[in-house]
Amino acid sequence: MMKKFIALIGFVAIFSACNVAQQLYGAYNMTQCKFDFKSISGLTVDGINLSNVNSISALNPLTLAKLVAAFSSSSGSLPLNFTLNLNVSNPNPQQALLNGLSYILEIDDVQMTTGTIEQQIEVAGNGSSVLPLTLGFDAKKVSSGQSLESLKNLIFNFAGIGSNPSNVTFRIKPNFTIGGNTFSVPSYIPVTFTLHK
């Protein structure tokens, strides 16, 4: 009986060591992955759905009226929520693992929002996967001091119907769980792209 117990403990120890090694390899492989902008989906402005809008003229009168009211409101708040989809490419032959990330979103050199997301992703060796990140910020608050036209253009750029492009930098710092402990890479990885028509 004791021999069986010792054998079981030995098996668990070996399995745990292998699991930690797998987590280490997965974390390292993720640091070698390439992150690229893919798309923005699920865009809402003050609760108004702007997904799949091809042009301002394509908006129905009711939606347009709601947008005008939201822009003109003196409440000082204009929540913008969306899903940022990143393409993650793994150049390694082994799987890459991610347990979460910290992020900083900057648009035209202005910081819009920061945060931490606990979201697991696995990318197969020599493969790619889409990492969907749910984000949001108060467009009026972060655009304080700018003109109404600048605010409109920022929001319409997210919908792909803006008149002037917005330069976006999304900085990410991947987090990994190894042996029950959480670690992160020492510096942020920048993902840059432009929002326009």
Show which residues each predicted segment covers.
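Extracellular/lumenal and peripheral-membrane lipid-interaction modules
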Residues: 19-197
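Positively charged n-region of N-terminal signal peptides that target proteins for export
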Residues: 1-5
